[in-house]
């Protein structure tokens, strides 16, 4: 994940994607398919199924053009595109960077003029797949291709790229959160960072020690727990570590459980003890903590991988594993982007050929090696490429090992609306001192209505 994901979040996709689903429901009532593909009604087929759709344009010998729209810039993919086109002179990739990406995709979907290739950030695969805008990938065929090495993808990718048990996008890039600390400050206080990360009790004790040396260190607080642009990002790790699950076995929301309450109570205890300031929204939620960390105002902080290059080298800092529950349960947030093929693509085999190259070891190596913005390597075998721009002294490889415990809530087609409800209810707890349990109960009632759709 990088700043590009943030850019899409800032577009506020909630109402936009909700319109896609609402239109789908309205059309279904009229016995019309999910999206209004007025210009070209193409059935959703399984990519890699062997359907010879390329013959429609391929017989003439004309070059196939695949239109690709993305929230990213062209230079991010330029080397991969050029390498693919050199190996495949019969296929041309027409790349277009779109600023208001979600709005444009909606407009094109309702007009039946979707691009062939669609970037899918966290939660978007499920929304577009449910709306009928994406084609399925034949995963059995991908796994059978030994050169592609499908099983090299991190296991976590399945949650982000599938809908209703089928793969509608393939993993491309992303980013997770981790923690960094000021080595000099910790050394002055005699604090040793456990290899596996602080337990909650150890984290509290470290905060206490840092506060006892506050004046000597020149800090305002040991750390800050920022209410990020998404409330889910802030609390997901703590809730998961406490033993909470977003979904129960019956598909209802479980974020009003005793474990969820315990997570809120623990974070609130850090505030009550004066170890962190009151939970608030600082700036856009991404750069604010790094700015304070660089200035020596806090001794440790949570950092998104895609913003970690803003950590200054004149500060003696290192990465550390995320805090973990006293029983060892550990969690962090992972965002993962995929790329899919639109349901209106007339050349899905050519599109799949490009996507397979882009997400192959060769393609991802070209993509990651010179990328100035850190991205996770979606393939386990390429993990070191994601943090190759950092000096080894910063221990940034911990962001790779952190993928073993990083994840996110279960993603469904109503994710955007769920995100809004969660944010509103968490705000009531943090900013209006609302009762934790009753607020979570009310939140779950609303979420269950969405989950039942």
PLM feature spans:
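Glycine-centered hinge/linker elements that transmit conformational signals in sensory
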Residues: 206-207, 250-282, 313
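Extracytoplasmic/periplasmic solute-binding protein
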Residues: 164-172, 177, 202-254, 268, ...
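Hinge/lid segment of periplasmic solute-binding proteins
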Residues: 122-178, 318-320, 385-391, 397-400
């Amino acid at each position: 994940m990088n700043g590009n994901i943030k850019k899409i979040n800032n577009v506020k996709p909630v109402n936009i994607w909700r319109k896609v689903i609402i239109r789908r429901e309205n059309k279904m009532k009229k016995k019309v398919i999910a999206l209004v593909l007025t210009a070209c009604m193409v059935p959703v087929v399984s990519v890699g199924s062997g359907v010879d759709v390329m013959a429609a344009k391929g017989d003439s010998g004309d070059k196939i053009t695949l239109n690709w729209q993305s929230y990213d810039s062209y230079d991010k993919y330029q080397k991969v595109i050029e390498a693919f086109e050199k190996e495949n002179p019969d296929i041309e990739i027409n790349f277009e960077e779109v600023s208001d990406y979600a709005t444009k995709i909606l407009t094109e979907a309702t007009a039946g003029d979707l691009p062939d290739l669609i970037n899918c950030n966290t939660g978007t695969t499920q929304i577009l797949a449910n709306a009928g805008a994406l084609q399925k990938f034949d995963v059995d065929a991908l796994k059978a291709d030994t050169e592609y090495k499908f099983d090299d993808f991190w296991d976590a990718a399945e949650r982000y790229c599938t809908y209703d048990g089928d793969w509608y996008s393939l993993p491309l890039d992303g980013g997770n959160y981790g923690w960094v600390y000021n080595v000099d400050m910790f050394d002055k206080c005699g604090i040793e960072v456990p290899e596996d990360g602080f337990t909650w009790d150890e984290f509290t004790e470290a905060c206490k020690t840092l506060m006892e040396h506050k004046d000597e260190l020149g800090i305002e607080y040991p750390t800050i727990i920022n209410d990020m642009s998404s409330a889910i990002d802030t609390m997901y790790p703590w809730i998961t570590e406490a033993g909470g699950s977003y979904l129960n076995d019956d598909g209802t929301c479980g974020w009003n459980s005793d474990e969820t309450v315990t997570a809120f109570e623990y974070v609130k205890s850090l505030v009550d003890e004066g170890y962190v300031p009151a939970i608030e929204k600082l700036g856009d939620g991404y750069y604010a903590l790094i700015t304070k960390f660089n200035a020596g105002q806090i001794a440790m902080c949570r950092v998104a991988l895609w913003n970690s290059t803003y950590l200054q080298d004149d500060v003696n800092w290192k990465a550390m594993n995320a805090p973990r529950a006293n029983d060892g349960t550990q969690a962090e947030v992972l965002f993962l982007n995929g790329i899919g093929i639109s349901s209106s693509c007339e050349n899905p085999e050519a599109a799949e050929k490009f996507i397979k190259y882009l997400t192959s070891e060769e393609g991802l190596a070209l993509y990651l090696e010179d990328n100035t913005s850190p991205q996770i390597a979606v393939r386990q075998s390429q993990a070191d490429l994601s943090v190759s721009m950092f000096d080894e002294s910063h221990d940034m490889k911990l962001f790779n090992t952190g993928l073993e415990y990083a994840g996110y809530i279960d993603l469904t087609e109503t994710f955007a609306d769920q995100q809004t409800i969660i944010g509103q209810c968490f705000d009531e707890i943090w900013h209006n001192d609302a009762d934790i349990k009753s607020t979570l109960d009310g939140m779950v009632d609303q979420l269950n209505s969405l989950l039942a759709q």
